[in-house]
Amino acid sequence: MKRTLELLQNGGTGFLPESKPHGWVRLMFENWNSLGIGTQSWKLDRLNYLITHLRIDIIAGCESQCNWTMVDTNSQFLALLAPGKATKGVAAHNKTERIQKDQAGGTAIVGIGRICDNISCMGEDHTGLGRWSWLRLGKGTTSTRIISAYLPHKPGHNSRGCTVWEQQSRYFEAKGDLRYPSTIFTEHLLDLISTCIAHGEHILLAIDANQDVYSGRLAQRLREPPFNITCMLEDATGETVPNSHFSGSRKISTIFGSKGIV
């Protein structure tokens, strides 16, 4: 996170807008690569700084890397986020296993401040694996489902069984499904999105997909009917999505959205 701020402030990809037009909703998404609950408080300090400085309304993220059942009440995500402001949301993790406190994976999405009054419901991945979390803004004929998700990638040969991929493999293999966790993830997520669209909801999907956000399998499926969902960052910034890590060469994280939201 520190490196990202340095790049942005020194002319890197994108910009840090300090003002927000009236009536706009600002959504922030990041792969935290561990929030460092109990070990790296600077990450939450910096996150809270950005929330205030950029007037963030909804924070979404993945790889929180915390089993929230193993930390006390004062260390829960909503208790640490945006002190003094109203918050409403979900921090999800794999509840099907009790591995360790700094458990790989996890997703979260939280509304901050006045936007909380517009959150009609919220939830998480029905399997209990924490693959995604979501909230819905509005209700009736005008509502938007905002999903924060993490699509796992296959680990190397030296992994020790604790990766997100391996956690999900164990869960589905126990149910007789031997497909790749990434394949199952895509199927389940598209089922959820299809149901939301059928109920008239708009979609925002903030995701670390671990595959190209233009040519990857998920991106290709999202462009097709009935989804018609595309990457929104290009429309918002006029530029293609940058590499998702300052030292990387892959575009794997973005925010997809229904047409007409921006």
Residue map of PLM features:
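Active-site regions of metal-assisted phosphoester/phosphodiester hydrolases
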Residues: 1-45, 113-226, 262
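Short, basic and Ser/Thr-rich N-terminal targeting/leader segments
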Residues: 23, 54, 103-104, 250
